[in-house]
């Protein structure tokens, strides 16, 4: 009798356990499986993909991070400004820009302390909007933590040994200049005290349009420490800047992409700041979040229409 009761109890426990496993499996699949459908986007029609030009560091990092292989974009633009203007004026467009470029569009008097508030205001007033990627909003905090999927570094590169004024400027960038970097993107390290040796000379800098706004602030900040230095800035793109440094046509290059192996052999480089690639849509587009896979598939031409994503 006791053996029969024991078998009965064990059978009941086994059945209950099996039911619980089934329930967990059902709800687990619902919460961890495919993402929620997008809002109704049928009125948006065809997707207009906007890309940067070949040679752009932002494009290189975008393609690399997302494994974009096609990049037969509907429209190609040659600057961050053109990208934002195109997306802002086109309801069905999707594009990508440096997160720091959004900050640069704001009041020129922005400080590191009020950047978050002004970015929040920008999201309400601009004709374009940054959206979440994989459910994570791009911000200084998510860039520092690495939680945002499309983070990247900003570089200064140079050939050979730096002269006195170039060394002084680079020391400024990596110390007190980090406060200026923080006003636009995210500093590589905490700002520190800087004492210039007030070397005389001229420095020519060329390269990335994403890094250029940061460099403008660094040049202005350095002038208060060393008025004897003259620094010229030419905005092109990362590849052009790096090639110019290799040829000796400029003293320093700005790059918003990682250096290629052959470039690393020919140039020395420093990471001066952290940034991210923000995905931008026209402000009236109802979409607020896309996965990295969805973005990749859009640029790999898997989805001709916005409604195809669903």
Q: Which positions does each model-derived feature cover?
A:
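Exported/periplasmic ABC-transporter solute-binding proteins
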Residues: 32-310
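C-terminal motif of bacterial Sec signal peptides marking the signal peptidase cleavage site
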Residues: 27-31
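Bacterial N-terminal signal peptides that target proteins for export
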Residues: 5-17
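Sec-dependent N-terminal signal peptides
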Residues: 16-24
């Amino acid at each position: 009798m006791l053996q029969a009761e024991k078998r009965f109890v064990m059978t009941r426990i086994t059945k209950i356990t099996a039911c619980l496993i089934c329930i967990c499996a059902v709800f687990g699949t619902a919460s961890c499986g495919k993402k929620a459908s997008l809002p109704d986007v049928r009125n948006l029609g065809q997707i207009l993909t906007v890309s940067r030009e070949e040679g752009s560091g932002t494009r290189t990092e975008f393609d690399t991070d997302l494994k974009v292989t096609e990049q037969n974009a509907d429209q190609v633009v040659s600057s961050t400004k053109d990208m934002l203007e195109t997306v802002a004026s086109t309801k069905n467009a999707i594009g990508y820009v440096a997160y720091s470029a959004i900050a640069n569009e704001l009041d020129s008097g922005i400080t590191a302390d009020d950047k978050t508030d002004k970015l929040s205001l920008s999201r309400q007033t601009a004709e374009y909007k940054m959206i979440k990627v994989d459910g994570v909003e791009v911000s200084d905090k998510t860039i520092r933590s690495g939680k945002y999927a499309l983070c990247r570094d900003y570089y200064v590169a140079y050939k050979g040994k730096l002269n006195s004024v170039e060394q002084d400027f680079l020391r400024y960038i990596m110390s007190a200049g980090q406060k200026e970097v923080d006003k636009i993107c995210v500093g590589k390290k905490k700002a520190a005290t800087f004492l210039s040796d007030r070397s005389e000379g001229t420095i020519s800098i060329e390269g990335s349009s994403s890094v250029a706004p940061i460099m403008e602030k660094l040049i202005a900040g350095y002038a208060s420490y060393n008025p004897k230095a003259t620094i010229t800035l030419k905005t092109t793109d990362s590849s052009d800047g790096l090639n110019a440094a290799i040829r000796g046509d400029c003293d320093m290059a700005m790059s918003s992409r990682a250096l290629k192996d052959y470039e690393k052999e020919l140039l020395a480089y420093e990471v001066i700041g952290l940034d991210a690639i923000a995905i931008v849509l026209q402000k009236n587009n109802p979409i607020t979040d896309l996965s990295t896979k969805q973005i990749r598939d859009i640029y790999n031409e898997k989805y001709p229409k916005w409604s195809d994503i669903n």
